[in-house]
Amino acid sequence: MPTTFQEIPRERPVTPLLDRADTPAGLRRLAEADLEHLADELRQELLYTVGQTGGHFGAGLGVIELTIALHYVFDTPDDRLVWDVGHQAYPHKILTGRRNRMLSLRQKDGIAAFPRRSESEYDTFGVGHSSTSISAALGMAIAARLQNSARKSIAVIGDGALTAGMAFEALNHAQEVNADMLVILNDNDMSISRNVGGLSNYLAKILSSRTYASMREGSKKVLSRLPGAWEIARRTEEYAKGMLVPGTLFEELGWNYIGPIDGHDLPTMIATLRNMRDLKGPQFLHVVTKKGKGFAPAEIDPIGYHAITKLEPADKPAAPKKASGPKYSAVFGQWLCDMAAADNRLVGITPAMKEGSDLVAFSERYPERYFDVAIAEQHAVTLAAGMACEGSKPVVAIYSTFLQRAYDQLIHDVAVQNLDVLFAIDRAGLVGEDGPTHAGSYDLSYLRCIPGMLVMTPSDENELRKMLSTGHLYNGPAAVRYPRGTGPNAPISGDLEPLEIGKGVIRRQGEKVALLVFGVQLAEALQVAEQINATVVDMRFVKPLDEALVLELAGSHALLVTLEENAIMGGAGAAVGEFLASQAVIKPLLHLGLPDIYVEHAKPAQMLAECGLDAAGIEASVKARMAKLGL
C-alpha cells in the first residue's frame, strides 16, 4: 500500500477478483477464502479512483471489509442497505455495478458523491446529511412487515452521526414497534469503547448465534409469566454483557447488542452477520474500524484525509495561480479571535464543524469559550439561546444546509425571545461537487420571513468582517451568510466597526438599468455593467431592506435586476418585489438567482453557468430583458 499522497496509483491496479465481483451477485459467487484478497484489491481500486477524481477518502478506506461482508451475507438490493451520510459509500458504489463510472465521481453529469436513489437500485435511500439512516431503515422495516415481506433492513451509522438526537429517536421507536432490523455502528474513532479483541469477537459470535437466541427467547416466554423472575434474569444478562461490552445503553433501549468486533476481521464479521440475519426484533452490531485503513497518512491524520483533491500528473506544468483573497471561512475565524479579545462575552459554538468553519485558532486561544456540540444542530441553537439569556454573546458557526435542521429552534428559542445570537452561515449558495444535499440554497428565503431577524450578504472579505461586527453588536438575532471558497482579495480593515444597519451602497452609477446585488455576485455585476452602462448597488442587507434606496432606484431606472445565489422563490429579489408592490410602484423587475430545481453536482463555475449567474449568463439575461422592454 502507498505511504504518501504522491504514491497513490495513477493507473488502475490489476484486480482479478474485483473484476469478477463488480455486482453483489458476482461477489457472492466468490469463495469466502478469497474475500480478504478482494478487500486488498478494493482498497487499491478506491485509492486509484479517488486519486483521479478527489473526494471523500478516509471513511471509505475504513469500511472496505464491512462493505464486502454486508453484500456477501445479505441479498442486496432486495435486502435494504442504508448508509448514513454517505461519505463511506464509495466501496459500495464500486461493488454495485458502478466501477466503470467512478472516474466521473462528483463531476458534472457523473455519479454523485453520496448514495442516490435515482442512480442505482442498491442506493435504497438518498443521504448527505447525518443521522438519518436508522429512521429510514426503520421505516423500510415497518413497510416490509405491512407488506408481509421477509426482506431485511440494515442501517450503517458512524459513531459521530450517533451523537445526533434523531438517531436516538429512531432507536427508541424501533424497540417500541419491535422492528426486525439491524443497526451497525461503524465506530471509527473509538469514542464509545476500546474493548476490541479476541474475547470480544468470541463473545459476539456466541451472543449472535441462533442457539443463544432461541435459549434467550425460550427463557423469556417462561419467565414472562413470573415478572419478578424475568426482570432479575434480564438484568443479570445485561450486567454480564456489560462487564465485557459497552452495550448497556442500547440494551436499555430494547436492542440486542452484539460487539464490539473488529471491523477488519472478515471471517468474524461474516459469521456474526450470518447469525444476526435471521434474529427477530431490533439488533445492534458494534464494529470498530480504522478510518483511512491501508493508507498510512490517512490513518495518522483521519481529519486531514477525510477528503482529498485529485492527483495531478507528475509532469504537468504548474498553472499560474489566479489572484484571490483568503477563504471567507478564514476571514470569519480571524474576526472571531479578534472580537473575542475585545469582548469577553463572546462564545463560539459549532456542530462538529471546527475545521470546516475555521474555528481551530479560536478553540486553541479560548478553549473555555469554545463549544463543539457534535452533530447536534438543534441543541447548538438552543444552547446559544440559553447562553444569550444570561448575557453571553454566542456566535453559532454553521453551514447553511445544516442550519435547516434547527429551524424551529431558530424561531422558537432565539427569534421569538429576541435573543442576541449571531449566526455565521458558511457554505451559502452552491458548493460544487457535493451537490444539492450540501448546497446552501434557501437560507435567505427562510431567514428573511422571521420577525426581528437581521440578515446580511457580504460581497467581499472586508464586507464580511464588518457584517460580523454588525451582527455581534445588534440587539437581537442576526445572520451573515457567506460562500465557500475565496474572496476577490479586497483590502481587509483591522477594526471591528459595524455598518449602518439597513443601508446599501452604490458601487457604480449608470443609467436605465440598476443591478441590485445581494452577495458575492458583485464582481460579475460590475463586469456586466461596463457592457451596458448599468448602475450597480451592493445591497448588503436583505433584512431590513434599504427601502429608500430601492424607491430611489425605481424612480430613476427603467429596469431593476436583483442578483443572489439563493433560491429565487422567497429570496432577496422577492423582498424587493414585495416592497415595491406594497408601495404601489409598478416597475419592470428581473430576478436572477437559483432556479426551482436541485442543481446537480459539478464544479462551482459550471453550476453558476448552468444557473445563469456567471458574468456571461447575467449579461445575456439582462440584455434579453432590455430588448423586450425596448431599452
UniProtKB/Swiss-Prot annotation:
Mg(2+) binds at residues 159, 188. It is an enzyme of class 2 (transferase). SMART domains: Transket_pyr. Thiamine diphosphate binds at residues 87, 128-130, 160-161, 188, 295, 377. Pathway: Metabolic intermediate biosynthesis; 1-deoxy-D-xylulose 5-phosphate biosynthesis; 1-deoxy-D-xylulose 5-phosphate from D-glyceraldehyde 3-phosphate and pyruvate: step 1/1. Belongs to the transketolase family. DXPS subfamily. This is 1-deoxy-D-xylulose-5-phosphate synthase. It comes from Pseudomonas putida (strain W619). The lineage of its organism: Bacteria, Pseudomonadati, Pseudomonadota, Gammaproteobacteria, Pseudomonadales. The gene is dxs.
